[in-house]
């Protein structure tokens, strides 16, 4: 008896948005770039690790640039013209990711710094006794 092959169909349609929000999370070890709509629903994302960088190369500004370039290419499917940029974290790839978003032709209205600053939050670890 011959097996029937089923055709995979996707009913998912690409949402058309005019304005979006670009979130850049630049940590010490990785940079994650996410594009959301104004309500915060994720449309596409990329990271330095997802672009193929491993180990200490993942934390470089070049890896962040490649992640932002990948997200900007994906954002063309949504016909996004303008965006706000929200930057979080102390990592190296912040400026290079922002620059890459500008190069992609997306009009940027606001660049906002969202890095959390502790008001003497967590207690530091106990001193080593040798």
UniProtKB/Swiss-Prot annotation:
GO MF annotations in UniProt: rRNA binding; structural constituent of ribosome
Family annotation (InterPro entries): Ribosomal_uS11, Ribosomal_uS11_bac-type, Ribosomal_uS11_sf
Keywords associated with the record: Chloroplast, Plastid, Ribonucleoprotein, Ribosomal protein, RNA-binding, rRNA-binding
SUPFAM superfamilies named among the record's database cross-references: Translational machinery components (SSF53137)
GO CC terms in record: chloroplast; ribonucleoprotein complex; ribosome
Subcellular location: Plastid, Chloroplast
GO BP terms: translation
Predominant cellular place of this UniProt entry's protein: plastid
Gene3D superfamilies hit by this protein: Ribosomal protein S11
Assembly and oligomerization: Part of the 30S ribosomal subunit.
Family assignment from sequence similarity: Belongs to the universal ribosomal protein uS11 family.
Other notes: This ORF was detected when the sequence of the chloroplast genome was revised.
PANTHER family per record: 40S RIBOSOMAL PROTEIN S14/30S RIBOSOMAL PROTEIN S11 (PTHR11759)
This protein's name: Small ribosomal subunit protein uS11c
Organism: Chlamydomonas reinhardtii (Chlamydomonas smithii)
């Amino acid at each position: 008896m011959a097996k029937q092959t089923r055709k995979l169909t996707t009913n998912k349609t690409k949402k058309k948005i005019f304005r979006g929000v670009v979130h850049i999370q630049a940590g010490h070890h990785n940079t994650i770039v996410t594009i959301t709509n104004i309500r915060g629903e994720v449309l596409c994302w990329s990271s330095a690790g997802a672009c193929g960088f491993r180990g200490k190369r993942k934390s470089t500004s070049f890896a962040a640039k490649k992640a932002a370039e990948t997200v900007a290419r994906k954002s063309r499917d949504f016909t996004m013209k303008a965006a706000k940029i929200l930057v979080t974290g102390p990592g190296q790839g912040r400026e290079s990711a922002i620059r890459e978003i500008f190069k992609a032709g997306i009009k940027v209205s606001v660049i906002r710094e969202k890095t959390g600053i502790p008001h003497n939050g967590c207690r530091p670890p106990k001193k080593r006794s040798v």
